Design a protein with these regions (language model features):
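Acidic, metal/ion-coordinating pockets
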Residues: 1-149
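Active-site nucleophile-His-acid catalytic modules used for acyl/amide transfer and hydrolysis
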Residues: 148-159
Length: 159
């Protein structure tokens, strides 16, 4: 069983108007992550947990501006939760692949110039699956020809 959790960093939500929606509740990223990931582990008992996080990694932040303080919390999430298998980050527009606190982290650049391919091999147990191995590979899309038909079909999205 695979569980996927989506998170957005505190710093990015300050400029949004989601609080105007009556069914939307905004709270601190780390608080929400701890509650929901604990709930998922206790109730759903996943074999594998992926977090998709619109925020970045402090270790690759080129600036340490005060206003970015709550934007790049991936390390904090990995360290304090410790049960995440893969965290996919976004925000800093740099390609990064690594491992911290037992969690694989990836971030795939910007403008679809690169992709990060994860290959995950599981080993079947009696009632569950166990991660046997995770490989990651950065794919440079500049090595591939553009699909002219697809470019025509998506032209309105690119304008």
């Amino acid at each position: 069983k695979i569980a996927i959790v989506g998170l957005t960093s505190d710093g990015l939500m300050k400029n949004e108007y989601a609080e105007m929606e009556e069914d939307v509740c905004i709270e601190k990223t780390l608080v929400s992550a701890k509650r929901w990931i604990r709930y998922i582990h206790e109730v759903e008992e996943p074999d594998f947990l992926i977090v998709i996080y619109h925020g970045g990694l402090n270790k690759i932040s080129s600036t340490n501006k005060r206003n970015e303080k709550n934007v790049n919390e991936a390390e904090k999430i990995m360290e304090e939760l410790g049960v995440i298998d893969v965290i996919i980050t976004a925000h800093q527009h740099q390609t990064v692949v690594g491992k911290d606190h037992g969690t694989i982290y990836v971030q795939a650049g910007q403008n679809a110039e690169e992709l990060v391919h994860l290959s995950i091999k599981f080993k079947k147990r009696t009632t569950s699956y166990e991660i046997e191995h995770i490989d990651s590979k950065v794919i440079d899309l500049n090595d591939y020809h553009e699909d002219e038909q697809l470019l025509k079909e998506t032209l309105t999205f690119n304008e």
